[in-house]
Curated annotation (Swiss-Prot):
Any one GO molecular function term: translation elongation factor activity
Misc. remarks from the entry: Binds calcium.
SUPFAM superfamilies linked: eEF-1beta-like
Entries under NCBIfam families matching the protein: aEF-1_beta (TIGR00489), PRK00435.1 (NF001670)
HAMAP family in UniProt: EF1_beta
Protein name as it appears in the record: Elongation factor 1-beta
Top-level taxon of origin: Archaea
PANTHER family, per database record: ELONGATION FACTOR 1-BETA (PTHR39647:SF1)
Amino acid sequence: MGDVVATIKVMPESPDVDLEALKKEIQERIPEGTELHKIDEEPIAFGLVALNVMVVVGDAEGGTEAAEESLSGIEGVSNIEVTDVRRLM
C-alpha cells in the first residue's frame, strides 16, 4: 500500500475568522495516521481567505475521511472540500 497527498480546502465562515488560530486548530486536529504537509492561504473574495491543507494519508479506501471529519468539526469552518489527490512515488 502506498501513500497519497490530498489537498483539502477549508473555507472559514467569514473574513473575521482568525486565520492563525484556525491554522493552529487544524494542526492540533490532524488525526492519527495522517501527516500534515503544509497549509497555504488562498484569497477568495471580499477579504475571505481559504486554507489549502495538504495532508499525506494511506491510499486505502476512505483515506481522507478521518481528516475531513476532523476539520469540518472546527468552530469557524463553513465547509471543506477535497480538491486534489495524488499518489506519492
